[in-house]
């Protein structure tokens, strides 16, 4: 497989895993506030989803390490996916606008990811 394509696929596994994990966390937080009586049913659904997310994360870590040969790049890619996905999901699900500190933190995270990938 093409090295660049393999790296992209490996990072995509990380992004999907982080996205599913964050989504399940936010769904249970949002819906628990709406209906505390159905917490157990919601917990079971989100437990299954976060288990799938864990599978994607494991696959993402093993393929990313194989592709990049550097665990630090894998860690940065994982953190970067969280920095991008979590604010998007938070805004989509909760309709809350980020604070200036959140925006600055996201910008610095993006800069850090770019620096780690280049050097």
Model-derived regions: residue spans:
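Polytopic alpha-helical membrane proteins, predominantly small-molecule transporters/carriers
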Residues: 1-119
């Amino acid at each position: 497989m093409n090295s660049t394509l393999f790296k992209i696929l490996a990072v995509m596994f990380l992004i999907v895993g982080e996205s599913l994990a964050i989504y399940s966390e936010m769904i249970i937080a949002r819906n628990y506030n709406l209906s505390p009586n159905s917490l157990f049913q919601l917990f079971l659904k989100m437990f299954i989803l976060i288990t799938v997310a864990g599978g994607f994360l494991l696959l993402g870590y093993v393929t990313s390490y194989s592709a990049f040969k550097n665990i630090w790049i894998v860690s940065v890619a994982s953190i970067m996916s969280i920095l991008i996905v979590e604010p998007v999901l938070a805004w989509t699900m909760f309709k809350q606008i980020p604070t200036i500190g959140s925006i600055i933190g996201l910008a610095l995270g993006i800069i850090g990811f770019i620096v780690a990938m280049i050097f």
